Amino acid sequence: PFFQGLFSWDHMPYDDEVYAQDDTPSLVNMTSKALDLLMAQGKDKGFFLMVEAGRIDHANHYSMATRALSETLAMDRAVEETVKRVVGEEPLIIVTADHSHTLSVGGYPGRTADITGVVRGDTGWVMKADDGQPMSILRSVLMSVRF
């Protein structure tokens, strides 16, 4: 069986925006529905399903670290749904990225620090970035990148 789920003329909304729009399915909802259709029509012969979470990249390009993490978690939920649904079916599940880089956390934050927070020194003072603004933990990773 072959089908496509096209829900937008352009990019899909970010995952945190989906829930404010009643007519737009989330990545996990689209994945679940695709699995329903594929398992009903092609279970005997197997099937191929590609799920893309391209908004992770978009959020990173615009330095929206919290949103990039939210998008990564949405993809994680889609993979989790897939694993749960195809258990015992001898699946081959491949998760990859087109840029194949990792997310690093810099600035030596404390062990329990919120990675979306600011970098603090030993006595609690807030570290400043080159532009004089408070340095966020994730922003410290991007300090050497010039946009």
Give names to the regions the model predicted.
Residues 1-147:
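A post-motif C-terminal structural segment
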